[in-house]
Amino acid sequence: MAKRIVFLMSDTGGGHRAAAEAIRDALYIRYGKDNVEATLIDVFRLSRFPMNYMPEFYPWLVNRSKASWAIGYNLSNTRGRANLLARTMYYTNARRFKKMIQTNPADVVVCVHSVITRAAMRAYDVLDMRPPFITVVTDLVTTHYFWYDKQAERCLVPTQAAYDRGLKAGLKPEQMRITGLPVDPRFMDSLVSKQAARAELGWLPDKPAILMVAGGDGMGPLHATARAISEKHLDCQLAIIAGRNRALKEKLEQTPWEQPTHIYGFVRNMPRLMAAADILVTKAGPATLTEAAIAGLPMIISDAIPGQEDGNVTYVVENNAGAYAPEPRQVAETVANWLHEGADALAQRAANARRIANPNAVWEIADEIWQWAHHESLPGKRRRRRLHRHREKSS
């Protein structure tokens, strides 16, 4: 009988769904699709107004109102406030959560979204018997207290910093494990040689390639940054990914460029693009940084969401895998300096990037989940209380 694995996530940014799908696909590959019944649930979509509009509101908030986002993130990031907000989310949506659980029976529950973790854990814990609950932290370094619930059976984290925050939040060492961040299990297999990737993509074989990414929604000043690099008249080629932002793609296509320039919309061949590139210009999203590290691609971080992505910048810079350049002019100057330093310096940064990666993370996470999928159901909060009272009477 197939094991039922429920993934709790939301499309607030692309990283949560990507992580859930990566783990699901690793389970399919490792244990067979006939043996795994995986369900992805966007919990915000099932929630009451206004939370059900978070997938639409989130990109605007983090891109257009960063100061407000930073204030909210930092004010809520204490043990007490995170718990209070999680309780509020649960009680506001208790009936909807109950229906979600009844409609989607599970042998194991996997949560890949910080805001959902504690509220969902509370929803499952009111059951008489509940499935094991596993949290997979998808923020790289700076992690919110929302992520850490002491009732979860496992909390799988990407870095030592995330592990240390879990300890501070009250989790026990045996509850946590450092695995790295999950990426598509086919990612490594798609990392062909630079020459092969460029031939497949139609890029010039002998010019350094600067890959520019703004995330799936095409957020950030990508056009201005690309123009700043182009106006340097460097001996290189540009590859610019506009994501789902059609207006940005059209603007890029209508712009005259001083170098050979390749323009893309939303892509599904990121491993090939990274394999073909020499330098990546990107925002500090954890999934893209992790993929770049696995690919051995030096990174110039041009933007970061306040709060959860601040630590990502420090992590990359302190490990000498990249640089931080928050203005288009600074990005262009960094690209020029790196190209001037030559191939050996770039190769060292590439080696540093690979050193901070764990390409096996998704397999380790899938194996952990599979083990828990075979675990017996666990007593919920009320049953635990009854068992405790029974033991007290017996003694």
Report each predicted region and the residues it spans.
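C-terminal alpha-helical cap of glycosyltransferases
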Residues: 358-395
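Conserved N-terminal ligand/cofactor-binding loop architecture of enzyme catalytic domains
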Residues: 22-103
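A nucleotide-sugar donor-handling region in carbohydrate enzymes
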Residues: 153-209, 214-216, 243-244
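A short, well-ordered alpha-helix in the C-terminal region of glycosyltransferases
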Residues: 344-359
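A donor-sugar binding/catalytic signature common to diverse glycosyltransferases
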Residues: 273-311
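Donor-nucleotide binding loops and adjacent catalytic segments primarily
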Residues: 194-199, 203-276
